[in-house]
Amino acid sequence: MQKSEFRQSLLVTHFEDTKFEALEANNGAPRPQFLYRQLGVEQATGGAYDAHVIKGVPGSKPPIAEHKHTELDFLFVYVLKGWMSFHYHGHGEHRLKAGDCHIIPPGLSHTVTGWSEDVEILEITAPGHYKTIDTANGVEVAPATA
């Protein structure tokens, strides 16, 4: 492995300084069922990475349409609270509960099929912005984090 060429700045994010927010579609949230707490990682790494905590909008319902991410090298999810179910194309259905995690390889079609009312997940991506494609019609869902 070669040492990364990007520069990063010191980042300290305090819980009380951030809040969960819905992201506008043009800001890259194809999942209006969720709220995002941005941790500042994308800014601190010049876009090389992103990290955010995601929680469900009360009363929101699954499923999330099957999709895949392109121009994405790394997607990691760690369940902090509750549970979330995923269907991975060719790999079946998996329910992740608090303490479980997954890495989704670039281009693997998947969908979110369910979640608990109290779900919270940590999602880390590289790079911070990437494309999300609806696999049913091949249309780009959003140009950024998904």
What are these regions (language model features)?
Residues 89-91, 114-115:
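Conserved catalytic-core motifs of eukaryotic protein kinase domains, centered on the activation segment
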Residues 49-53, 101-103, 116-133:
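A short hydrophobic beta-strand segment most commonly corresponding to one strand
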Residues 90-107:
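Short acidic-glycine-tyrosine-enriched beta hairpin
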Residues 1-58, 134-146:
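A short, N-terminal "cap"/entry segment at the start of jelly-roll beta-barrel domains
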Residues 53-57, 69-86, 124-127:
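Short, conserved beta-strand element in jelly-roll/cupin
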Residues 44-49, 59-76, 90, 97:
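A short beta-loop-beta micro-motif enriched in histidine and acidic residues
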Residues 107-108, 113:
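Short, surface-exposed secondary-structure boundary micro-motifs
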